[in-house]
Amino acid sequence: MKLTCVLITTVLFLTASQLITADYSRDKRQYRAVRLRDEMRNFKGARDCGEQGQGCYIYPCCPGLTCLGGGTGGGVCQPQ
């Protein structure tokens, strides 16, 4: 009888801990996606202007920089 009670208690405890862990990991995945989205927004390639030394054939240069050497291959952003 004691062994049966111990087994039932153990099974209930393990089931409850799995349910709690599954709930927790689902929430973590959601927040991880938000964090990754924010990191992608701040990614170097996601900017709308070229920084010093970067090409200016796709995006215009950032404020304070000028596109120099704009031949067929495009120019490079340099200080004014």
Swiss-Prot record:
Residues 23-47 form a propeptide. Disulfide bonds join C49-C62, C56-C67, C61-C77. Keywords: Disulfide bond, Hydroxylation, Ion channel impairing toxin, Knottin, Secreted, Signal, Toxin. Expressed by the venom duct. GO terms for cellular component: extracellular region. InterPro entries: Conotoxin. The modification 4-hydroxyproline is found at P60, P63. Its main location: secreted. One of its GO terms (molecular function) is toxin activity. Residues 1-22 form the signal peptide. It is found in: Secreted. The keyword Signal applies. The keyword Ion transport does not apply. The presence of a 'disulfide through disulfide knot' structurally defines this protein as a knottin. Ion channel inhibitor that inhibits the increase in intracellular calcium upon depolarization in DRG neurons. In vivo, both intraperitoneal and intracranial injections into mice induce hyperactivity. Belongs to the conotoxin O1 superfamily. This is Conotoxin Vi6.2.
